[in-house]
């Protein structure tokens, strides 16, 4: 008898799913590739499109699927700038992930929602994520200062 399958949209722009698998501990691993062409040169700021290989494989946490933790696995593309001296390479930045974050932006949003009326410790336990990972979401996504210059009036609730 064939195993039943369900298709779940990732809702991530500019990616193609290459493979899905469930590892030994029951986590869903989704191998993807970017379909976005080009990136911005880290030195001159121009758009560059000359491919120059790939970074190492990267695995980041994504939204849970049917109660299972899921991870996105991909190799970021590298591009070379032919205008700058030394022809430096730049890793493609993706709209759905912040640089150096262990999570997708969608998972960051999920964790922030879980933090409503909960502590960092509570969310860490519920999600099976390290305390520092949950704290990192707060530090990356929530501003600790207010730009009062953007407000002309404060209303009364």
Specify the residue positions occupied by each region the protein language model found:
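Short, positively charged, Gly/Tyr-enriched micro-motifs
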Residues: 59-157
């Amino acid at each position: 008898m064939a195993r039943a399958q369900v298709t779940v949209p990732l809702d991530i722009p500019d990616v193609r799913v290459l493979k899905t698998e469930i590892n030994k501990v029951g986590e869903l691993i989704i191998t993807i590739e970017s379909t976005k062409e080009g990136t911005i040169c880290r030195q001159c700021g121009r758009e560059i499109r000359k491919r120059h290989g790939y970074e190492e494989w990267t695995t980041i946490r994504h939204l849970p699927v049917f109660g299972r933790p899921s991870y996105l696995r991909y190799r970021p593309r590298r591009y070379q700038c032919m205008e700058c001296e030394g022809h430096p390479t730049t890793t493609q930045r993706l709209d759905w992930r912040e640089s150096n974050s262990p999570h997708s932006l969608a998972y960051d949003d999920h964790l922030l929602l879980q933090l409503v009326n909960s502590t960092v410790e509570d969310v860490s336990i519920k999600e099976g994520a390290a305390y520092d990972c949950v704290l990192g979401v707060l530090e990356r996504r929530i501003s600790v200062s207010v730009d009062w210059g953007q407000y002309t009036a404060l209303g009364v609730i």
